[in-house]
């Protein structure tokens, strides 16, 4: 799947077909603002791909983008992530196939789009 920013029902269909998709991590009143993120979490298919966050209780993910969007800008941070993703992680990217890759960026461009692209190519 080339475009991870699909309508909710198409992203769920993609997950059911074993493809990786991107979802938004943000919650309001305990529920995800992205219905696909909630569905994927309930189904045990959500993988958090971001930094540690004390306020939300998220632990640092091995899939995080180490380059700051705030400091470098989105395009530069994504370019650096794409260019420097290590071979060890590239070898493990197959474990993301059929998972909802969760980050705070969605629906904006995100490093998870690249991870989904790699996973879906496996």
Where on the chain are the PLM-derived regions?
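Catalytic phosphate/metal-binding cores of nucleic-acid and nucleotide-processing enzymes, i.e., regions
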Residues: 2-122
């Amino acid at each position: 799947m080339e475009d991870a920013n699909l309508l909710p029902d198409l992203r769920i269909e993609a997950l059911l077909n074993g493809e990786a998709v991107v979802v938004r991590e943000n919650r309001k009143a305990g529920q995800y603002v992205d219905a696909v993120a909630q569905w994927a979490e309930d189904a045990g298919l959500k993988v958090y791909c971001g930094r540690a966050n004390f306020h939300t209780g998220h632990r640092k993910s091995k899939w995080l983008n180490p380059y700051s969007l705030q400091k470098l800008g989105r395009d530069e941070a994504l370019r650096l992530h794409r260019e420097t993703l290590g071979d060890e992680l590239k070898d493990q990217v197959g474990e993301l196939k059929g998972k909802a890759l969760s980050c705070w960026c969605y629906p904006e461009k995100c490093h998870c789009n690249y991870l989904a692209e790699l996973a879906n190519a496996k």
